[in-house]
């Protein structure tokens, strides 16, 4: 089974498998099993063990690079179950090959297309369409939405099954889910045939007396008031403030790796922050690892509507190729995603990941009418790393947002088309749904996401504290801080009455001023535990959704809270996160390497305003530094003078606005930095992660004297074909004054820099906050020592 060794093509061990690496793995597997008729379900990176990666990443010489491995799931014709393997690309050998019988793999787009074809050509399905009122001439406009069947006790988990939600599109103009049909075929995808059709006791024929076309373009044209919006332009004439090398991105003081796989989509790894020249580890790995969408109606087929979109379909597989219609403005950097289809062919999703910057409003502001020299303000920008994926009728837009004050936000926007049902006129929905159109209803449902966080705050040994706001006996406000020691004690839920948050902290590192452990606070108020009853089909695999917070000891193979295989999993035994906790309920999670599992989401009670297409609705969570930095980490930002804005009448028409259809170009940003940490001291990995030493390998700049006038130049990256950014600034400097206000929100900050008065000093235009802080009477700067100190004046 050995194959000639393959020299892997990658920049970092966490990079996704390249096009050539995927092709190499497919060929190696086929040559190793030439007599087998196999199809591919998954070929993806098998991430290196954390211990191996951290040792290599933070060692002084970067020695001991982990082997490059692929994780493979294949199916063999007429053989139940799946074959799971590990392929070592470094050695050219298959290290693991196991057959799992009672297991159903992830459902790929190829399989969904096959199911649709099977259903539309089945004679019994065609008969049911006619019974529902579909005319003979309209049979070609019948479509199905293939879903995994969940778990159906009639069939167990030994067969690969799907259920087909049926729809009729009258004419050529409506969308594919215009009119729902009232029956549900069951398909055996291995036998490629319909094995049953579930039919309700009370039939619900399609409406014949209303225009149910539901064509979005047509409805748009029929709106009485068509508003032509004047275009809003986002431009970055001097380029972007981020740098990319391989899949590492450096922006402001953040540096992190962007991964991508078939199941989770975007994976953020090795997230560090540069504070005054020290590279401080924040998080080893952050990703969305599951999403449950349970529906609330009872009766015919509705009890099976409980999707696990990551575990059953894979949001990487379902990712849209992004374009300039996705809502991103400005200069955009894209990353593609390569996958293997069931035939072993390599397919590419172009522009699967978008990276761009957005204006973020006020960063901070202070006004003092008694001393206007003390007035300061700064405007913020944010970095957005995003993907968009389609899960059946829903569209999910996932945004990972990095802010200049050290905050990391996850925002998810939900839009798309409602999952609808056929109903009879005046039918009582018993509170389980809403009629959104004549004879069409939509069920109540939930969207529950599981965020997996593996922290690395100044080291590998972290803890989690529950923080509540309470009144003490004197009626004053105090915080209650509880640090659980076991996985059972750590289970908790959001409490709005106490404003509950969770501190992910390092008890071994205390803040020099507050004396509290350095931490990042998890703020999440879009929370709701799963409302399905325990033991029902809708609660299968949903152990992760029963509470908002779980904490477990770190294990390399514990990634997915619904287990490795979610499709058609029964509720007989605990799986995934539920199993890990039940196996060792007293496992210690204090001051050790931990994983935080957070369930958040929303409850959706549909309304007519959601039909025929839903306005986007957002949910948010934040990871915010608390007692982590010595001071506001965004103080290295130039003060803001917005020279590009203008006052105008709301009725003013600007003739110079260009056509909104003008094509914008994305730019690949230049990159010339090495993301590795250079540490000359021969310390243990744990010591290095407590507080990574100041990077001695980067070029140093002299400490600027307090009396010396700062004459730094903006180091904004210039795009090809643009004039040098420094020259541009010099030409405009006289117009903008000493504050250098032009394009202040495009001011570029490299992670490299020098210590200036205790703040991390970046080159930039005038008006730096360090200079402005000299006007505040109770603060001085000890430039000789390069430290920031507080002094009380006599």
Curated annotation (Swiss-Prot):
GO terms for biological process: amine metabolic process; cellular detoxification. The modification 2',4',5'-topaquinone is found at residue 394. Its main location: cytoplasm. PANTHER family: COPPER AMINE OXIDASE, COPPER AMINE OXIDASE 1-RELATED. Copper amine oxidase-like protein that does not show any copper amine oxidase activity. May be the appropriate amine substrate for cao2 has not been identified yet. Mn(2+) binds at residues 593-594. It catalyses: a primary methyl amine + O2 + H2O = an aldehyde + H2O2 + NH4(+). Residues 637-649 have a biased composition (Low complexity). This is Copper amine oxidase-like protein cao2. Belongs to the copper/topaquinone oxidase family. It comes from the Eukaryota. Binds 1 copper ion per subunit. Can also use zinc ion as cofactor. Contains 1 topaquinone per subunit. It comes from Schizosaccharomyces pombe (strain 972 / ATCC 24843) (Fission yeast). GO terms for molecular function: copper ion binding; oxidoreductase activity, acting on the CH-NH2 group of donors, oxygen as acceptor; quinone binding.
């Amino acid at each position: 089974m050995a194959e000639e060794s393959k020299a892997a093509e990658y920049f970092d061990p966490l990079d996704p498998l390249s096009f050539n690496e995927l092709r190499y793995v497919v060929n190696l597997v086929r040559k190793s099993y030439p007599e087998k008729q196999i199809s591919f379900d998954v070929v993806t990176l098998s991430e290196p063990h954390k211990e191996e990666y951290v040792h290599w990443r933070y060692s002084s010489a970067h020695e001991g690079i982990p082997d490059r491995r692929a994780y493979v799931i294949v199916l063999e014709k007429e053989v139940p179950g799946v074959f799971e393997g590990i392929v070592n690309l470094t050695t050219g050998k298959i290290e693991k090959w196991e057959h799992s019988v009672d297991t159903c793999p992830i459902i790929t787009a190829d399989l969904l297309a096959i199911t649709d074809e099977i259903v539309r050509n089945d004679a019994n399905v065609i008969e049911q369409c006619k019974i529902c009122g579909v005319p003979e001439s309209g049979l070609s406009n019948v479509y199905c939405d293939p879903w995994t069947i969940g778990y159906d006790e009639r069939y167990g988990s030994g067969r690969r099954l799907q259920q087909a939600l049926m729809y009729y599109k009258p004419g050529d103009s409506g969308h594919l889910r215009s009119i729902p049909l009232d029956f549900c075929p069951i398909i055996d995808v291995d036998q490629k045939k319909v094995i049953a059709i579930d039919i309700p006791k009370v039939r619900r024929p399609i409406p014949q007396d209303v225009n149910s076309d539901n064509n979005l373009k047509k409805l748009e044209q029929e709106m009485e008031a068509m508003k032509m919006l004047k275009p809003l332009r986002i431009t970055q004439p001097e380029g972007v403030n981020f740098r990319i090398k391989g899949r590492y991105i450096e922006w402001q003081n953040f540096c992190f790796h962007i991964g991508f796989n078939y199941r989770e989509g975007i994976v953020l790894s090795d997230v560090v922050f540069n504070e005054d020249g020290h590279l401080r580890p924040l998080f080893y790995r952050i990703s969305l690892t599951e999403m449950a969408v349970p529906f609330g109606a009872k009766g015919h087929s509705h009890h099976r509507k409980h999707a696990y979109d990551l575990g059953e379909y894979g949001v990487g597989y379902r990712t849209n190729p992004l374009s300039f219609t996705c809502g991103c403005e400005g200069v955009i950097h894209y990353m593609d995603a390569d996958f293997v289809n069931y035939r072993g062919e390599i397919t590419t999703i172009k522009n699967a990941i978008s990276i761009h910057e957005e204006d973020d409003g006020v960063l901070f502001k202070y006004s003092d009418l008694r001393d206007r020299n003390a007035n300061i303000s700064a405007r913020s920008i944010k970095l957005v790393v995003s993907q968009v994926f389609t899960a059946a009728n829903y569209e999910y837009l996932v945004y990972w947002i990095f802010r200049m004050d050290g905050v990391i936000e996850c925002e998810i926007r939900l839009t798309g088309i409602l999952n609808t049902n056929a109903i009879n006129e005046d039918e009582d929905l018993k509170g389980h749904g809403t009629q959104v159109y004549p004879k069409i209803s939509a069920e109540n449902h939930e969207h529950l996401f599981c965020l997996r966080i593996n922290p690395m705050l100044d080291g590998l040994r972290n803890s989690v504290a529950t923080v509540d706001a309470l009144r003490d006996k004197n009626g004053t406000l105090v915080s209650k801080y509880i640090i659980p020691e076991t996985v059972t004690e750590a289970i908790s839920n959001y409490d709005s009455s106490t404003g509950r948050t969770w501190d992910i902290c390092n008890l071994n590192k205390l803040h020099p001023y507050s004396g509290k452990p350095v931490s990042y606070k998890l703020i999440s108020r879009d929370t709701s535990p799963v409302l399905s009853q325990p033991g029902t089909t809708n609660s299968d695999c949903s152990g992760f959704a029963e509470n908002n917070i779980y904490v477990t000891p770190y294990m390399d193979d514990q990634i997915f809270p619904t287990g490795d295989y979610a499709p058609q999993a029964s509720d007989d035994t605990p799986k995934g996160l539920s199993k890990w906790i039940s196996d060792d309920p007293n496992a210690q999670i204090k001051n050790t390497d931990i994983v935080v599992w957070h369930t958040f989401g929303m409850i959706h009670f549909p309304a007519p305003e959601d039909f025929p297409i839903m306005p986007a609705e957002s949910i948010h969570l934040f990871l915010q530094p608390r007692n982590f930095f010595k001071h506001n980490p965004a103080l290295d930002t130039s003060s803001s003078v917005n020279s590009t804005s203008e006052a105008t009448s709301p009725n003013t028409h600007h003739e110079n606005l260009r056509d909104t259809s003008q094509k914008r170009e994305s730019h690949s940003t230049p990159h010339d930095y090495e993301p590795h940490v250079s540490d000359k001291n021969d310390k243990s990995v744990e010591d290095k992660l407590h507080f990574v030493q100041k990077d001695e390998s980067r070029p140093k700049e002299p400490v600027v004297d307090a009396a010396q006038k700062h004459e730094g130049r903006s180091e904004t990256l210039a795009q090809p074909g643009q004039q040098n950014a420094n020259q541009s600034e010099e030409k405009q400097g006289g117009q903008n004054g000493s504050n250098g206000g032009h394009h202040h929100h495009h001011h570029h900050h490299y992670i490299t820099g020098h210590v200036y008065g205790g703040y991390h000093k970046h080159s930039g235009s005038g008006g730096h906050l360090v200079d402005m802080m000299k006007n505040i009477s109770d603060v001085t700067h000890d430039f000789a020592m390069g430290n920031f100190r507080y002094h009380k004046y006599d």
